[in-house]
């Protein structure tokens, strides 16, 4: 089971007065619910946990490793995110190309990327959506 530690974590958006200040939180349960009102910082927290945003202060540790020190590919192997609104997530014209883009973040052989993307789509029943 993985553990997530958040120590004195802060992030402030420049365009608005918002601050997420998390102090010494440890999550080791198999399932944790993050709840709060709109604008409370749930999405910001997950963007910090996936490396889409970088905290101004504090440390994120996953399984004892400082997440901020990991390379982008190492972060991708530890944490993933699916956005509520797919328009915020998908950039490629087809499902296959979107999955290939994700695979290409951890390898560079084109044939292997295509093969792995198609296998992933087949596993989730989307292999008919490749065009």
Model-derived segments and spans:
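ABC nucleotide-binding domain signature
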Residues: 33, 73, 77-84, 93, ...
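The feature captures the beta-strand-to-loop junction immediately N-terminal to the Walker
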Residues: 35-37
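Conserved Walker
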Residues: 43-44
């Amino acid at each position: 089971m993985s553990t997530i530690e958040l120590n004195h974590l802060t992030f402030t958006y420049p365009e608005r007065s918002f601050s997420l200040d998390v102090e010494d939180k440890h999550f080791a349960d198999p399932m944790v619910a993050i709840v709060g009102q709109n604008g409370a910082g749930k999405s910001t927290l997950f963007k910090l946990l996936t490396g889409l945003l970088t905290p101004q202060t504090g440390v994120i540790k996953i399984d004892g490793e400082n997440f901020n020190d990991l390379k982008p590919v190492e972060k991708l192997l530890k944490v993933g995110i699916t956005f509520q609104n797919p328009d915020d997530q998908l950039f490629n014209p087809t499902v296959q190309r979107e999955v290939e883009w994700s695979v290409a973040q951890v390898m560079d052989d084109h044939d292997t990327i295509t093969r792995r993307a198609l296998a992933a789509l087949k596993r989730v029943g989307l292999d008919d959506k490749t065009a």
